[in-house]
Amino acid sequence: MKVLEGLKYSKEHEWVKVLEDNKVSVGITDFAQDELGDIVFVNLPAVGQEIKVGETLASLESVKSASDVYSPVSGKVVEVNEKLKNSPEIINDDPYGEGWIAVIELSDVSVLDTLMSAEEYKQFIGE
């Protein structure tokens, strides 16, 4: 499983990349996409939606199952990855790059301190 340095990770297998201007991008980890199998549908959040840690950010459907993506941060959704609507398999192909799900403007940056480092996440998934 690929785990990228420089990202933060949640116990629900989401990753967080810190951007500029108090914003972060969020997606699911390589571990999560591998567990789900081939993703065939993505239900994205609405731009402008206020979200809190632990709330459902998006829903994914794969050939094996359906799964919610829980927000690892609190804030306002300012951008979503529209490409996923027509090509949800991008998440399988490139979960840390083109497969990002949303950009969130943080309401509280201290939540980043509660997330795991790459090393901690590797231990969490038993790598």
UniProtKB/Swiss-Prot annotation:
Organism from which the protein derives: Coprothermobacter proteolyticus (strain ATCC 35245 / DSM 5265 / OCM 4 / BT)
Official protein name in the record: Glycine cleavage system H protein
Stretches assigned to the Lipoyl-binding domain: 23-105
N6-lipoyllysine modifications at: 64
Required cofactor names: (R)-lipoate
Family per record: Belongs to the GcvH family.
Subunit note: The glycine cleavage system is composed of four proteins: P, T, L and H.
A Gene Ontology cellular-component term: glycine cleavage complex
Key word Acetylation present: no
PANTHER family: GLYCINE CLEAVAGE SYSTEM H PROTEIN, GLYCINE CLEAVAGE SYSTEM H PROTEIN-RELATED
Record bears the keyword Transcription: no
Function of the protein: The glycine cleavage system catalyzes the degradation of glycine. The H protein shuttles the methylamine group of glycine from the P protein to the T protein.
